[in-house]
């Protein structure tokens, strides 16, 4: 079993299977969370933000893209509230290096320049007594389109992009169009709609 970059995952998989070994190789991630309007407000907002910000977003199962179906503004507003309560240095650690901090903040800036809306901005985060630390605050970016780099490339930081979808079919199409297929999730109180995502989404884990 391997989790890491796509380049190395291909090498591991090729070498393992050439010797008839069973292998699970997960390479890269851009995990999509499909959120429907009927999703439980507090639970959904809390889990999405925790998945985005936990380990400062430096984990393969972190939430990277939220696909909001129809009108989920009430959930987004709650997410903003949850994210603003996170304090770098207290309940959010640093990213791994100065280069990582610069790269992550570059994605946020690129999204802003491309027309996205920064709802919570983690750029320039500092911690008293640790001013030289590599901190990026939780970041929520709304009105993102699938072609923006912040939505299509792995960031590995506490950043989540929100893409709006008119209905569940469009949301599943957005998830399936991603070059990454590590994991996906669905937030709804409808078993039938959840089953549709489970059956139609192309992610390896749902």
Across the structure, where does each feature detected by a protein language model lie?
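ALDH superfamily catalytic-core signature
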Residues: 4-146, 174, 202
């Amino acid at each position: 079993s391997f989790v890491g970059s796509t380049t190395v995952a291909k090498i591991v998989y090729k070498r393992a299977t050439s010797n008839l070994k069973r292998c699970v190789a997960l390479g890269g991630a851009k995990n999509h969370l499909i959120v429907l309007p009927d999703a439980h407000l507090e639970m959904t907002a809390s889990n999405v933000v925790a998945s985005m910000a936990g380990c400062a977003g430096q984990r393969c199962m972190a939430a990277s893209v939220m696909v909001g179906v129809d009108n989920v503004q009430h959930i987004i507003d709650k997410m903003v509230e949850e994210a603003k309560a996170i304090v770098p240095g207290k309940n959010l650690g640093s990213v791994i290096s100065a280069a990582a901090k610069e790269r992550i903040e570059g994605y946020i800036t690129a999204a802003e320049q491309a027309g996205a809306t920064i709802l919570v901005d983690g750029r320039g985060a500092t911690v008293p007594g640790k001013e030289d630390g590599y901190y990026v605050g939780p970041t929520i970016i709304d009105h993102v389109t699938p072609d923006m780099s912040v939505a299509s490339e792995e960031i590995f930081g506490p950043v989540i992009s929100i893409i709006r979808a008119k209905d569940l079919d469009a949301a599943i199409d957005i998830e399936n169009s991603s070059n990454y297929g590590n994991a996906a999730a669905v937030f709804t109180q409808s078993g039938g709609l959840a089953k549709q995502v489970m059956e139609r989404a192309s992610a390896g884990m749902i």
